[in-house]
Amino acid sequence: MAALTKADMAERLYEELGLNKREAKEMVEAFFDEIRGALSHNEQVKLSGFGNFDLRDKKQRPGRNPKTGEEIPISARRVVTFRPGQKLKQKVEAYAGTQS
């Protein structure tokens, strides 16, 4: 399975929208900067037809060092979660159905 990179996205903008390569790269960077900025200000990011990025606070919990077996605390932290939207779920399920 190949991965879609930011460079790939910029290349598609260049090919499909006729932006020059610098503009395409800047547009992709600006898109991700907006998402990062919103999340850093504790805002939810909703992309219609794609999904939602949310912030979740995780409490401190006990963990274990896999090498030594020693119990160590895993500190409380904030994590980014992604919940796919219905359209994305349907596309993935339809694609997965053609791969069997």
UniProtKB/Swiss-Prot annotation:
Entry GO MF terms: DNA binding; structural constituent of chromatin
Gene Ontology CC terms: cytosol
Alphabetical list of Pfam families matching this protein: Bac_DNA_binding (PF00216)
SUPFAM superfamilies (UniProt xref): IHF-like DNA-binding proteins (SSF47729)
Region (Disordered): 53-72
UniProt KW keywords: DNA recombination, DNA-binding, Transcription, Transcription regulation, Translation regulation
Any one GO biological process: regulation of DNA-templated transcription
Assembly behavior: Heterodimer of an alpha and a beta chain.
Family listed: Belongs to the bacterial histone-like protein family.
Name of the protein this chain belongs to: Integration host factor subunit alpha
Natural source organism: Marinobacter nauticus (strain ATCC 700491 / DSM 11845 / VT8) (Marinobacter aquaeolei)
Gene behind the chain: ihfA
